[in-house]
Amino acid sequence: MASRVVEPLVVARVIGEVVDSFNPSVKLNVIYNGSKQVFNGHELMPAVIAAKPRVEIGGEDMRSAYTLIMTDPDVPGPSDPYLREHLHWIVTDIPGSTDSSFGREIVSYESPKPVIGIHRYVLLLYKQSGRQTVKPAATRDHFNTRRYTAENGLGSPVAAVYFNAQRETAARRR
């Protein structure tokens, strides 16, 4: 199972540019608009991702706590992402086997608004060592997932998924 989950993340350079290689161990389901499930590499329209998704997580039991991070490594555009990364969302203290609504939103959801090219939006799940141990990020701009997770003692991700989005033009809306 692990290689099927990790391989698309390697191909899309999520592993390498955002996080180091890891072994997925927890189920992660991301659903926008009640029915649009996120699968690695699929494209979602900006209108679909305007409101925060429902994020369901597995895990052993409700005593385990998880942190969810959503970031865009392609800012301002994928060919020259000199502003990498832009932070879109952080939810902490999510009990295992529940969803993100049971956690603490320490950085509110910011709707993706890609301007130049096709952007990758990455959702990463980390197991916490305890509750209320993760601090809010200082800024959304120039966010660094590796540094942030190291500073907060989060270790390697236990799950990840990414999707693509690009600016909606009038022609694409038809």
Curated annotation (Swiss-Prot):
InterPro entries: PEBP, PEBP-like_sf, PEBP_euk, Phosphatidylethanolamine-bd_CS
Domain of life assignment: Eukaryota
Gene Ontology, cellular component aspect: cytoplasm
GO biological process: flower development; vegetative to reproductive phase transition of meristem
Keyword Cytoplasm (UniProt): yes
Localization terms from the record: Cytoplasm
Tissue: Expressed in vegetative axillary meristems but not in the main shoot meristem.
Pfam families from the UniProt entry: PBP
Record's note on what induces expression: Down-regulated at the onset of flowering.
Main location: cytoplasm
Keyword Cytoplasm: yes
Secretion signal span: none
SUPFAM superfamilies, A to Z: PEBP-like
CDD domains, per the entry: PEBP_euk
Key words, A-Z: Cytoplasm
The protein's role, per its UniProt record: May form complexes with phosphorylated ligands by interfering with kinases and their effectors.
Similarity section: Belongs to the phosphatidylethanolamine-binding protein family.
Protein known as: CEN-like protein 1
Gene source species: Nicotiana tabacum (Common tobacco)
